[in-house]
Each structure stands twice: as C-alpha cells, then as structure tokens.
UniProtKB/Swiss-Prot annotation:
GO terms for molecular function: ATP binding; magnesium ion binding; phosphorelay sensor kinase activity; protein serine/threonine kinase activity; protein serine/threonine/tyrosine kinase activity. Homohexamer. Pfam families: Hpr_kinase_C, Hpr_kinase_N. The gene is hprK. GO terms for biological process: regulation of carbohydrate metabolic process. CDD domains: HprK_C. Residues 264-269 are annotated as: Important for the catalytic mechanism of dephosphorylation. The keyword Membrane does not apply. Mg(2+) binds at residues 160, 202. This is HPr kinase/phosphorylase.
C-alpha cells in the first residue's frame, strides 16, 4: 500500500485542486521534486515523470513565449499516466492547455499561494519523512533529558516498569512494546508509537494504562530522535560486563549505527536511575567530557609517577 498519495499533499498543504480530480489517489513514490524548465523548451529525454512537477514564475513566463501548438505539445508530454501531480506556485494562473491535458490523462493540477522555493522545501521535507525507510523494534522509547533512549531486552526483563519509573521522575514516554523507526536522513532515526498503542503502557499485573490520562500531556511525546540504545539483560555471573566504559558498543538499525549500552538486571538495581545517568553521561560525551578516558589518563599518570619515584 502506498505511503503517500496526491490527496495527502492536497490536505497537508491546503492546495487548490484545479483539474484532474480523478487522479488524486495516485501514489507518490519519491521525495524528489521536478521543476520542468528544460522540458518547457522541448527536451523530454530525461523527464522524471514519476515525480511531483512544480511550476513557478520562471517556467510559466518562458512557457508564455511559446506558440499555441508548442504549448499544447509541452503540456501533453508533461502529463503522463505515472505523474502524481503538477503544482502551480505563487497563485499563478493555470494555463488552459495544462487543464485540458490533465483532464485527458487524469493528472491532478494543484495551485498554492506559497513561493516556489518555500513550497519546494516544505514539500520535500514532508515527503522525505513519509517515504523514509522504516522498521519496527520490540522495546520502549523514552525521552530522558532530551536524549531519545531506546530500551530493549527480552520480554519480562523490566522494560515497561523502567519506563513507568522514568515517567514518574519527569521524563516522557514515546512508545511501549513496539517502536516504529524511520530513517528520515543519513544518521537520523526517529521513533514513534503505532497509532493503535499510542500513549499506552503495559505493566504485568496491572494491565494496560494510559500514560497521558494518568500523568498528563507532559508525560508523553508523539515521536523522538533515537540517540542511545540500552539493552537490559538478566545478570549472568559468567559474563564479563564493561566496568570502565572505555569501549563503545554499537548496534545497527536500518543504515544507522547507534551507541549501545548493555545493563545487567538483578534485584536491588535501580534501573531508572541507571538509565538517567546513562543519558546524562551520553550527553557529556557528545560535549567532549569522557569520565572513563579521564580516569584512564589519571591512572597512566599515576603509574608513570610511581615508576619515576622508584627510579
């Protein structure tokens, strides 16, 4: 099923539908737009017909210099059976030749009052967001001190309980159990909850609770960029866990690598506080402050000083 259709951008940007109403359900498959300036001159060899076509003052002013026959030919070739739509910006008058051709091919022709560059930018951002590669991950996404923390782990390890404690401590829930992740840009992953379970949290023994109703609108978010992955696992006495934090583990989601921390779970450990400190420490590292490296440097200096004293 197509993620975006022409009718979606008509509603989103409040576009005026001028003609070609039969084609408003055409799918939009790419976020790239086309400004068919060279096509107005008659060169259609590399015409990207599958894109939204955006006509501004430049294209239409050149179009007006053409003869009537040329105008008809250009618009006939501009309107194809795979063109999702043609948008006229700045509220400019729509050429009658375009209306005729669009009605024949059922290509929606829309008009916007926005300036061409602004419309192009907003439309591209919207389509990139909607058409971004997506995946779904089993886990909980929480906004902790402005850091999007994805908490993963096996069922029953305590992900939802940790999220509940974090919300009680003033942080915000984004998604529980299933996190839908979109790669909106290179290195940018944005997580959100499926519409069916938005703002809901499941606690074993309590059932499903509505976090917005219980804690207010300030306790939830609709989406958040993911910066850190924390994997909860049951404590294994035979496994060596990182005690210094010098080595940074990575996990790949879609085409993006994220920092991953593995936190062992055992009775008596306050996971919510650990997640809070992990988020703050992650922010410090991004600001250039690394406690593990500072300790390592101090230790090296102490060893070297000791060797000099021994000599």
């Amino acid at each position: 099923m197509p993620k975006v259709r022409t009718k979606d951008i008509i509603e989103k940007f409040q576009l005026e539908l001028v003609s070609g109403a039969e084609g408003i359900h055409r799918p939009i498959t790419t976020s790239d737009l086309s400004r068919p300036g060279i096509e107005m001159a008659g060169y259609f060899t590399y015409y990207p017909a599958e894109r939204i076509q955006l006509l501004g003052k430049t294209e239409l002013s050149f179009y007006e210099t053409l003869s009537l026959e040329e105008k008809k030919m250009r618009m006939e070739r501009l309107c194809t059976d795979i063109t999702p739509g043609i948008i006229i910006s700045r509220g400019l008058e729509v050429p009658p030749e375009l209306i005729e051709a669009s009605e024949r091919q059922s290509v929606p022709v829309m008009r916007s009052t926005m300036k061409t560059t602004r419309l192009s930018s907003r439309l591209t951002n919207y389509l990139e967001s909607k058409l971004a590669p997506t995946t779904a991950v089993h886990g909980v996404l929480v906004d902790v001190y402005g850091v999007g923390v994805l908490i993963t782990g096996k069922s029953g390890v305590g992900k939802s309980e940790t999220a509940l404690e974090l919300v009680k401590r003033g942080h915000r829930l984004v998604a529980d159990d299933c996190v839908e992740i979109r790669q909106e840009d290179e290195g940018v992953l944005v997580g959100s909850a499926p519409e069916l379970i938005e703002h809901l949290l499941e606690i074993r023994g309590l059932g499903i609770i509505n976090m917005m109703t219980l804690f207010g609108a300030g306790a939830v978010r609709t989406h958040k960029r993911i910066s850190l992955v924390i994997d909860l696992e049951l404590w294994d006495p035979n496994k060596q866990y990182d005690r210094l934090g010098l080595e940074e583990e990575k996990v790949k989601i879609l085409d993006t690598e994220l920092t991953k921390l593995t936190i062992p779970v055992r009775p008596g450990r306050n996971l919510a506080v650990i997640v809070e400190v992990a988020a703050m420490n992650f922010r410090l590292k991004r600001m250039g402050v690394n406690a593990a490296e500072e300790f390592s440097a101090r230790l090296t200096d102490a060893i070297e000083d000791g060797e000099h004293d021994y000599e």
